[in-house]
Amino acid sequence: MVPPSKKRKLPAATGPATKRSKNIPKPSSSKKKSGKESRSTVEAGALSWASVGEDFGGLEVIEGVDVVKDGNRVQFLVSGDKNKSNIIDPQQEVVDGDRPFEGFGDDAVEVGDIDSGEVGSDQAGAESKKPQGKNKGKNEPKEGQEKADQETNKKQKQKQNKNKLDGKNGAGNKQDEQLVKAAQGVQKSSTRGGNTFGALADGNDYKDQEDVDMAAWVSLNLSPQIISAIAKLKFMKPTKIQKRTIPEIVAGHDVIGKAQTGSGKTLAFGIPMVERWLEMQEQGVKRTGPMSLVLSPTRELAKQLGDHLKALCDGLPSAPYVCVVTGGLSILKQQRQLEKADIVIGTPGRLWEVLSGDRALQSKFAKIRFLVVDEADRLFKVGQFKEAEDIIGALDGKSPGDDAESEEESDEEDEDDEDAARQTLVFSATFDKDLQTKLAGKGKSSGNDDEKMAYLMKCLKFRGEPKFIDVNPVSQMAEGLREGLIECGAMEKDLYLYTVLILNPGRRTLVFTNSISAVRRLTPLLTNLNLTALPLHSQMAQKARHRSLERFTASRNSILIATDVAARGLDIKEVDQVLHYHVPRSADTYIHRSGRTARGESSGISVILCAPEEVLPTRRLASKVHAVRSAGVKREHFIQTLLIDRKAASRLKPRVDLAKKIADTILAKEKAHSDDTWLRNAADELGVEYDSDDLEEINAGGGKGGRGGGRKRKEQTAKQLTKAEMGALKAQLREELSRRVNLGVSERYITGGRVDVGALLREGQQGGMFLGNTDGLGFDL
């Protein structure tokens, strides 16, 4: 007998079946669902997606659809009874608000009611006029009525738009042109793979760009693309160095440019390089490697040069690829970037590390069109950057081991070589070799300009006589800079440094020292005094150096304590004052240090803390920096002696001594732990026993005399402070910092009439530190 599960059950014949309409789907028996239903493959765009809402970021969902992955393809399967409910009829009328975006057309933009989104409504209604083909049935009268209502509403809106356009004046036409420009900006951005929404945002800035007068840049024979990019940077007119050097560089001459700090030397060589790259793109010149090489003495300056050139290129429809090659970062990533780089900016050490082992890369760099040496006097200082000379030799096809005779022969051959198409551009604020001599020794004048530039001519290969452009031959200091000097003892510099910072609160300050150890000591000292102090020196990791610069730029009251690694080229906005904790070793260092403030048309101050043993170097510094300035200047002294309030300094001394003791103790403990770890590891490697107590006795017994004996005894004493003693010192310092410094106010008879109590209360609410009046630094304005 056949099992019951395999028997076929026939439907009961109750009567003749009614005739089914074509538009009514055939009802399927629930008992047939055990078999597979017929499913069809549908494209994702043809499905009727339903929007969840704006709260979910515009998420759309659909029901009754199976998703099947076939290899790399994704298919959407819809069952037969749900085809019509989940699939959008392509011939159905598309409403303007629901029609998908198909990109901008080539026709002119028709401006309508912007708030209601009716721009280009004629194109939106083009699809709705198509006749409906096979969609006929019971719902036909209802759909026809909806279509008639939509056409009526559309005609009314078009009539309203026409009335609005007829009533607009010239201002409306100008707005229309701006919208057209914005749409064109979107098309340009999309063609080059940029951010479309960023282009839409840029369309709102056309009015601001039209207000910028760029007539001063037009006379420099620059392309409209470059002028437009400069306009986006809001540079109204070129600086003196830019106005004189850009035409010479564009004409193909080698240039040596000298200008004061903060005068725009970066764009003076950056604009011609980008201009040349645009010309090569228009001419269809095939890329054979990097077009330009820029050498920088420090990592921070190299990064800044790259940021400035990238900002210039951001305003171009097509821009060169700028690559920064510095130490402290991944060398593999930099090697990959060099494969596609057009403009390379690097420091000599890392750049030579990349070039030295790659002959193919050296051959590509030998074909560069521009060689730019920024801060050339620092790069080619005798005995400083051996890698810079090796890089120049590699560009000329020489190996580092070539002797002098082979170099002379190659120089004679290169003079007859017509393929030497490389332009050499040299920029700095100081080319006088006399400024590089040490202030502590006796230096002789190096003579005229020809003798001063002779050392550069030996290092660099110019195609001929370079154009020497000096825009400020009289003064090498910025016009808005005021210079001052504070006389103090060698052991009182910490006190007077803190006094200057307190007398000038709310200023972004840059403190320069001559040693890394001073940076490591001053940073915790000022931090203990509740000041935002940040370190910067060459032994820090590169990411830590970037972090210090970013924090210094972000905070208005921050203090950056740095060595001369931050003296050249750094363009930090709104640096109010520069303090020289040590007198610089050379005059050119003082010029570049002071150039971190008073950049461009802004003002700033530069103050030297001068100890008695530094008086002679300070006099030589003043004579070298300001000797050429004529007597027609109004100021009697270029470096003014500041009569700082000694009473305020004496009242601040207790808190400075406490902070210094805490900082020295922490540094001594860290140093002892580091030395102990090193000696213990060395003893383990040698296989001998290490006894720290015996070593301490030896070190303590050798303190009778000799150099550094007193310092070692102080470190030994600071090392022995216990944790409880450190806590007591910190509590005492907190108590000192919580009180305001009294500068002569009678606390016992405060209502006697001689004290402005209201002013004291207001100063206390604003964070004032003193009780009484202070004269500041005493600059003669």
Swiss-Prot record:
ATP binds at A259, Q260, T261, G262, S263, G264, K265, T266. It catalyses: ATP + H2O = ADP + phosphate + H(+). Gene3D superfamilies: P-loop containing nucleotide triphosphate hydrolases (3.40.50.300). One of its GO terms (biological process) is rRNA processing. Keywords: ATP-binding, Helicase, Hydrolase, Nucleotide-binding, Nucleus, Ribosome biogenesis, RNA-binding, rRNA processing. A motif (DEAD box) lies at residues 374-377. It is found in: Nucleus, Nucleolus. SUPFAM superfamilies: P-loop containing nucleoside triphosphate hydrolases (SSF52540). Residues 104-116, 402-419 have a biased composition (Acidic residues). Residues 246-449 form the Helicase ATP-binding domain. InterPro entries: DEAD/DEAH_box_helicase_dom (IPR011545), Helicase_ATP-bd (IPR014001), Helicase_C-like (IPR001650), P-loop_NTPase (IPR027417), RNA-helicase_DEAD-box_CS (IPR000629), RNA_helicase_DEAD_Q_motif (IPR014014). Residues 1-10, 19-34 have a biased composition (Basic residues). GO terms for molecular function: ATP binding; ATP hydrolysis activity; RNA binding; RNA helicase activity. Its EC number is 3.6.4.13. GO terms for cellular component: nucleolus. The keyword Hydrolase applies. Residues 494-643 form the Helicase C-terminal domain. Its main location: nucleus. Residues 137-154 have a biased composition (Basic and acidic residues). A motif (Q motif) lies at residues 215-243. The keyword Endoplasmic reticulum does not apply. The Q motif is unique to and characteristic of the DEAD box family of RNA helicases and controls ATP binding and hydrolysis. Belongs to the DEAD box helicase family. DDX24/MAK5 subfamily. This is ATP-dependent RNA helicase MAK5.
